[in-house]
Structures are given as C-alpha cells and as structure tokens.
Amino acid sequence: MSHQWADCERAFIAARYDRIAGLIGFIDWLFFVPRHFRAHAVKRLGLRPGQRVLEIGCGTGRNFPYLRAAVGPQGRIYGVDLSDGMLAKARALCGRERWTNIELAQEDAAEYMAPEPLDAVLFGLSYNTMPHHLAVLHHALKQLRPGGRIVIMDGKVPSGLGGKFILPFGLWLMRHTMLGNPLIKPWQHLAAVADHFEMEQFVFGSWYVCWGSKPTGAQMGALPYASERLIAAE
C-alpha cells in the first residue's frame, strides 16, 4: 500500500529526526510506548556476553543500556541512523556512561556494512519509518551469521473497531512526528525469511515484538531468494 510519506528523500527524513531528537522521551509517552517494551525486545535477541549486535535506526541510544547489559563490555554494539541530531545524543550518552564498545555510523541502513559478522540485529522502533524497509531487512540478513536472530519492535494499528477509530489520528500523528507507516506488516516480512518465527503483542495489539533466526545448514539455500520472498510478503 502506498502512502504520501513513502517516497520521502533521505535528507527530508534525516532533517525531521534532527528536529525531534530532543523529544524522543516525550514521543514515547505520546504514543503510549509500554514501559518495559525496549528491555523486552532486547531480551528476545537472545544475546550472550561477548556477542556482536547491530541496531538499525538506533536514534538517541535508548536501547543501548539494555544491549550493553546483554553483551557486556567485551561485546560489540553497532548503531546506524540517518540523523546526525539523533546520533549526537547517542554519542553524548556513550560518553557519559564511558561505553567504549559502541560504534555509531550515520548512513543508510540499506548500505551500511558492519565490520564483522553479526550475532543479532534489532530494529528498534525503526522498521516502519523506512520507505525501503524490505531492502534493509534483506541487507541485514546478509550480515547476520547463520542462526543469528533478528528482532523487530514497533507499533501497529490494533484490529477491530478500536483500530479503525484511532487510525485517522494515528496516521496524522505519525506524519507530523516519526514519518512511519503503521499499516505495513513487518511480522509477515520477517516470517517469510526467518526460522523459528514468533510474535508477541502488547497494549491491546498496539505494539509488538517479533523475532526469528537466519536459516542454517541445508536451509541456507533459500536465502538467495529472500528478496523475492520479501516482495511476495509485502
């Protein structure tokens, strides 16, 4: 489905997030982001000390405390974001906390290459804000080790009359803040290319965490066709 913000240029998206970088805490409150949502999503990554994780759309680093606790000081965290304003706040956070194992990059996530194979990838409230989300997901899969896990945490429109009632306001609010599209179905995209897919919903279906693993062994042959499978799921 096409929406008026789906063709936003990178510069426009980056500029919008530069402007709202100081408001992310307020926006979490405005959208009723569940209190333990971020910690729960990171838990679903199944990270162990010393592992390597990439957060796509890392923003101001609000997930970094949970990621750092999971991988420890010997692990490695990579964060990529289009917005310099967001990354400036993330760098400041890392400086205050003296986290030296977090590497940040201002780049399109569909082009960013982590310097080493990844154990896990997190889309932290970012998947539905990227017009080219399918390309980003496919690119993330290529960087993930076999058996590595991808987690997508995001918001969606609840089913039923409640969802229909709040949809017009939700779309208006997204256009004026995060530029996201809550009508896409990332869980279908991930389920099309991942093993052991699971999904949980929160706050009457307004928020979800879904996860799955990159296929291993004999199933690896399916991965060259991931692009086609993703398009079919769209």
Question: Residues of each region from the PLM?
Answer:
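Conserved class I S-adenosyl-L-methionine
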Residues: S2-G46, R62-Y66, K89, I166-L173
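Helix-to-beta-strand junctions that scaffold the AdoMet/dcAdoMet cofactor pocket
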Residues: G72, M130-P131, L144-R145
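C-terminal alpha-helical "lid/dimerization" subdomain adjacent to the S-adenosyl-L-methionine
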Residues: C8-A11, L30-F31, V151-Y208
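Class I SAM-dependent methyltransferase SAM/SAH-binding core
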Residues: L54-I56, T60-E111
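A short acidic, Gly/Pro-enriched loop at the edge of an enzyme's catalytic core
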Residues: A110-V121
